[in-house]
């Protein structure tokens, strides 16, 4: 089978800021980023999806499912690693790809134009898309007035009729009714019969079992398991059952541990996995806190040095802008008067010199 999507060492990293002021400061002063922690939404993902496959993606909230769907659809780029996609992708997700200020017809036209359709082709597709979405008179209304189900209907209808090579469905069926769900399932089965590749992301295990050939379990931003759907789903359900049996305090501690692990640098993460991180060598203290005092001093010195440079540039620019204005208008008249006065005085002095010469 031919691979349609290949991910090699793909990671997505975000820098966490406490507020918008710190984020803005980091944009203009990159060195201040050293004070903030990096968070891995995805880490070292290696994955191959073949032509005609339907891959189900499962995982608890925050495991990286939506991030990987956005990367596969080229909505966002990976921070690290390489990705190869052989074919045109179409992402179906709530609130993704729809302009909230445009109505249904305008969104259909916009998305079809982005997929390379001509005006004539769009006119021919419009009735089929409108019928599939089945949102009634709301097709004439701005998308911002739609419910989540309506957005999902319209998004799926557009993507299904643009005939993509790879269809990525991210929780888009979770907000629809049973009638619409069956309609979407029939369309997905039609795509499978056409040997198209589908990535299906859902919390609904029953949907994953019914639609998928293989299942990817993402956990804490990493691939926990990938393979036979029955085996992977069983392991996932065992984990969920184990987690649900924990006390409230144990659940919070487990969540905090996972959160801290995703914030580690790669080398520290490897040490954590090998049980070398922490003061006791048992991985109990995975986070190495940066020396914020020294970093703060360095950042402050660097910030004020940049401020001085900016002040010098500003004053220099102001000098060259203000001085020429002094020679215009009233300023030039004053200079002319000064010049005339100087000439008169010089003439008087010369007359005195001439008179003295005569007297001599």
Swiss-Prot record:
One of its GO terms (cellular component) is plasma membrane. SUPFAM superfamilies: P-loop containing nucleoside triphosphate hydrolases. Residues 270-290 are annotated as: Disordered. PROSITE patterns: ABC_TRANSPORTER_1, ABC_TRANSPORTER_2, TAGH. It is a peripheral membrane protein. Gene3D superfamilies: P-loop containing nucleotide triphosphate hydrolases. It catalyses: ATP + H2O + teichoic acidSide 1 = ADP + phosphate + teichoic acidSide 2. Its EC number is 7.5.2.4. Residues 24-245 form the ABC transporter domain. ATP binds at residues 59-66. Keywords: ATP-binding, Cell membrane, Membrane, Nucleotide-binding, Translocase, Transport. It is found in: Cell membrane. One of its GO terms (molecular function) is ATP binding. InterPro entries: AAA+_ATPase, ABC_transporter-like_ATP-bd, ABC_transporter-like_CS, ABC_transpr_TagH-like, Bact_Polysacc_Export_ATP-bd, P-loop_NTPase. Pfam families: ABC_tran (PF00005). Its main location: membrane. Belongs to the ABC transporter superfamily. Teichoic acids exporter (TC 3.A.1.104.1) family. The complex is composed of two ATP-binding proteins (TagH) and two transmembrane proteins (TagG). Part of the ABC transporter complex TagGH involved in teichoic acids export. Responsible for energy coupling to the transport system. This is Teichoic acids export ATP-binding protein TagH.
């Amino acid at each position: 089978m031919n691979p349609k999507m290949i991910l090699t060492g793909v990671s997505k990293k975000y820098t966490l800021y406490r507020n918008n002021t710190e984020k803005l400061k980091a944009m203009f002063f990159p060195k201040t980023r050293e004070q903030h922690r990096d968070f891995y939404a995805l880490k070292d993902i290696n994955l191959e999806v073949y032509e005609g496959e339907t891959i189900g993606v499962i995982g608890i909230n925050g495991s990286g499912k939506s991030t990987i769907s956005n990367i596969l659809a080229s909505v966002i780029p990976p921070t690290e690693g390489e990705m190869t996609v052989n074919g045109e992708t179409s992402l179906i997700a709530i609130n993704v790809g729809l302009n909230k200020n445009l109505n249904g017809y305008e969104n259909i036209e916009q998305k079809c134009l982005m997929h390379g359709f001509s005006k004539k082709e769009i006119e021919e597709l419009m009735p089929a898309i409108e019928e599939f979405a089945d949102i009634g008179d709301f097709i004439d209304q701005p998308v911002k007035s739609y419910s989540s189900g309506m957005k999902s209907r319209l998004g799926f209808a557009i993507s299904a009729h643009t005939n993509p090579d790879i269809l990525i469905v991210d929780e888009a069926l979770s907000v629809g009714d049973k009638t619409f769900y069956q309609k979407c399932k029939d369309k997905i089965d039609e795509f499978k019969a056409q040997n198209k590749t589908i990535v299906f992301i859902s919390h609904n295990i029953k949907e994953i079992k019914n639609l998928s050939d293989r299942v990817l379990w993402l956990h804490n931003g990493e691939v926990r398991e990938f393979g036979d759907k029955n085996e992977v789903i069983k392991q996932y359900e065992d984990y969920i059952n184990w987690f649900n049996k924990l006390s409230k305090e144990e659940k919070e501690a487990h969540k905090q541990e996972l959160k801290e692990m995703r914030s580690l640098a790669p080398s520290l993460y490897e040490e954590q996995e090998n049980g070398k991180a922490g003061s006791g060598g048992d991985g109990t203290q995975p986070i190495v806190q940066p020396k914020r005092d020294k970093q703060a001093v360095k950042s402050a010195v660097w910030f004020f040095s940049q401020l001085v440079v900016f002040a010098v540039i500003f004053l220099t620019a102001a000098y060259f802008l203000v001085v020429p204005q002094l020679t215009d208008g009233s300023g030039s008249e004053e200079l002319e008067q000064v010049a005339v006065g100087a000439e008169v005085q010089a003439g008087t002095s010369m007359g005195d010199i001439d008179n003295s010469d005569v007297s001599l």
